[in-house]
């Protein structure tokens, strides 16, 4: 009898595929098509990280909250989902819908029900790496939840934030450096506590986090929003099409992030593979290819991408229509915003909409001027340091890009020491200034020592600006 029912289910599926119709199969057929992975003793784990703070970075926490709702609806247990977010957005005075976070113009609230595992200053590098390793004793604060996985388990890590060559932002100092992250992933593999691990990364220059650093053979498959040399993009921003509701003055999401999340919501994760999603997300994130867009990349064990998404994200029974899809039905935006300019978009729209003569307009004007002044200070300081160190060759040395497949820098300790030397004299690099991490890495690759950097930074920066963006109150970024 079972064989007959199974054959009938298969027959109906093939008829639907040929005719183009969508057939909702009965639960017994669903069981027939369910991958064998669901029948083993494996457990799904997830780590979701929003690595920023500030209302102008609304989109990162919106991405992560939306990802949580997707996994929860997919049946991933709450106790197995670890969430890192500063949690300063939902109840922020700038939020036009207090207590609510949306990730798309017509989206539902994605904030309600999201666990507050690690918030505020608990969102830091040490806690994140301890969570991935399952090391409860190394935690400081938070819920104490870690990835306590076993050898048959599957892990999904999603990180949304600002980035720069070789570095990922954190709302607390220091930032997360590529070598430290990859070292922890290697330790996790050596511990024998997972069967496969998938890492989705949203950040500028995110390809540099894994390029030349993540080897094959660790059963890790990673995709990134951009290659090692380009920005990633915010989306659903004011002035775009589609645009957020009129009361919002900030971007609601990030292009790569909403691409994979919205794809997951519209397709059957029991049949869609990691590779199929990669191709769809790559197409949507590429945008126009001229005015905007980035190159989604993949690293590690590419063969792992043949696995079904259900293995890592679960599946929502409402989406189990078993329709194979090779076209992304979601319309790409007409225009998007460079990740590094999203804060300026917020400040500018805040200024434009504020009543003339109001305290809000004065505040917004100050925020725009402070942000622009900080950018000029960092850009000019790095350029001048390059000239002081390398003379007329400074610009060429600072902007040199290593061949594909090579890591950003040979000596990561050197990179961190030069970052600290710069910040001691010139102030914080900030979420904007980490775009210059390649320039500092190239100083190391050219043999520059910390003493030389100190001397050059002292000449380039007689004083540290008083701007909040330059403040070192939170400590050094390395």
Swiss-Prot record:
<keyword id="KW-0926">Vacuole</keyword>
<keyword id="KW-0788">Thiol protease</keyword>
<feature type="glycosylation site" description="N-linked (GlcNAc...) asparagine">
    <location>
        <position position="321"/>
    </location>
</feature>
<keyword id="KW-0645">Protease</keyword>
<keyword id="KW-0732">Signal</keyword>
<dbReference type="InterPro" id="IPR048501">
    <property type="entry name" value="Legum_prodom"/>
</dbReference>
<dbReference type="GO" id="GO:0000326">
    <property type="term" value="C:protein storage vacuole"/>
</dbReference>
<comment type="function">
    <text>Asparagine-specific endopeptidase involved in the processing of vacuolar seed protein precursors into the mature forms. Probably involved in post-translational proteolysis of seed storage proteins in the protein storage vacuole of developing seeds.</text>
</comment>
<protein>
    <recommendedName>
        <fullName>Vacuolar-processing enzyme alpha-isozyme</fullName>
        <ecNumber>3.4.22.34</ecNumber>
    </recommendedName>
</protein>
<keyword id="KW-0325">Glycoprotein</keyword>
<keyword id="KW-0378">Hydrolase</keyword>
<feature type="active site" description="Nucleophile">
    <location>
        <position position="204"/>
    </location>
</feature>
<feature type="glycosylation site" description="N-linked (GlcNAc...) asparagine">
    <location>
        <position position="135"/>
    </location>
</feature>
<feature type="signal peptide">
    <location>
        <begin position="1"/>
        <end position="20"/>
    </location>
</feature>
<dbReference type="Pfam" id="PF01650">
    <property type="entry name" value="Peptidase_C13"/>
</dbReference>
<feature type="site" description="Required for post-translational maturation and enzyme activity">
    <location>
        <position position="251"/>
    </location>
</feature>
<dbReference type="Pfam" id="PF20985">
    <property type="entry name" value="Legum_prodom"/>
</dbReference>
<dbReference type="InterPro" id="IPR043577">
    <property type="entry name" value="AE"/>
</dbReference>
<feature type="disulfide bond">
    <location>
        <begin position="414"/>
        <end position="444"/>
    </location>
</feature>
<keyword id="KW-1015">Disulfide bond</keyword>
<dbReference type="GO" id="GO:0006624">
    <property type="term" value="P:vacuolar protein processing"/>
</dbReference>
<feature type="disulfide bond">
    <location>
        <begin position="426"/>
        <end position="461"/>
    </location>
</feature>
<feature type="active site">
    <location>
        <position position="162"/>
    </location>
</feature>
<comment type="similarity">
    <text>Belongs to the peptidase C13 family.</text>
</comment>
<dbReference type="GO" id="GO:0004197">
    <property type="term" value="F:cysteine-type endopeptidase activity"/>
</dbReference>
<dbReference type="InterPro" id="IPR001096">
    <property type="entry name" value="Peptidase_C13"/>
</dbReference>
<feature type="disulfide bond">
    <location>
        <begin position="237"/>
        <end position="251"/>
    </location>
</feature>
<dbReference type="InterPro" id="IPR046427">
    <property type="entry name" value="Legumain_prodom_sf"/>
</dbReference>
<dbReference type="GO" id="GO:0051603">
    <property type="term" value="P:proteolysis involved in protein catabolic process"/>
</dbReference>
């Amino acid at each position: 009898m079972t064989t007959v029912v199974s054959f009938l289910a298969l027959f109906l599926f093939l008829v639907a595929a040929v005719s183009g119709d969508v057939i909702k199969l009965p639960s017994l057929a669903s069981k027939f098509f369910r991958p064998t992975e669901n029948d083993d003793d494996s457990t799904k784990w997830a780590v979701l990280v929003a690595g920023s703070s500030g209302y102008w970075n609304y989109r990162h926490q919106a991405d992560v909250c939306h990802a949580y709702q997707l996994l929860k609806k997919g049946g991933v247990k709450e106790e197995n989902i670890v969430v890192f977010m500063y949690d300063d957005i939902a109840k922020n005075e700038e939020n036009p819908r207090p207590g609510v976070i949306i990730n798309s113009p017509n989206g539902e609230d994605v904030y309600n029900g999201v666990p507050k595992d690690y918030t505020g200053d608990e969102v830091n590098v040490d806690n994140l790496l301890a969570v991935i390793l399952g090391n409860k004793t190394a935690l400081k604060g938070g819920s104490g939840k870690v990835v306590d996985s076993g050898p048959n388990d599957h892990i999904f890590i999603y990180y949304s934030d600002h980035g720069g060559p070789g570095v990922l932002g954190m709302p607390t100092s220091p930032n997360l450096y590529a070598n430290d992250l990859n070292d922890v992933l290697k330790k996790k593999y050596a511990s024998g506590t997972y069967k496969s691990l998938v890492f989705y990364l949203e950040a500028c220059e995110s390809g540099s986090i894994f390029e030349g650093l993540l080897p094959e053979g660790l059963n890790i498959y990673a995709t990134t929003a951009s290659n090692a040399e380009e920005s990633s993009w915010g989306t659903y921003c004011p002035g775009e099409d589609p645009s957020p509701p009129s009361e919002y003055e900030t971007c609601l999401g990030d292009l790569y992030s909403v691409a994979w999340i919205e794809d997951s919501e519209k397709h059957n994760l029991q049949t869609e593979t990691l590779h199929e999603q990669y191709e769809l997300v790559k197409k949507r994130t590429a945008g126009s290819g001229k005015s905007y867009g980035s190159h989604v990349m993949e690293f590690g064990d590419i063969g792992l991408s043949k696995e079904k998404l259900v293995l890592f994200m679960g599946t929502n029974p409402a989406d189990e229509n078993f329709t194979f899809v090779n076209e992304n039905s979601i319309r790409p935006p007409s225009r998007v915003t460079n990740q590094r300019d999203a804060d300026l978009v917020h400040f500018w729209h805040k200024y434009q909409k504020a009543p003339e003569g109001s305290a809000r307009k004065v505040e917004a004007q100050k925020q725009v001027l402070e942000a622009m002044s900080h950018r000029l200070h960092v850009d000019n300081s790095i350029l001048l340091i390059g000239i002081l160190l390398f003379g007329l060759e400074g610009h060429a040395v600072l902007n040199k890009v290593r061949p594909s497949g090579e890591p950003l820098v040979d000596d990561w300790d050197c990179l961190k020491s030069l970052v600290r030397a710069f910040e001691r004299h010139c102030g914080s690099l900030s979420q904007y200034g980490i775009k210059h991490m390649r320039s500092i890495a190239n100083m190391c690759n050219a043999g520059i020592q910390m003493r030389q950097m100190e001397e050059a930074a002292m000449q380039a920066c007689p004083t540290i600006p008083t701007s909040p963006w330059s403040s070192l109150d939170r400590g050094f970024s390395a």
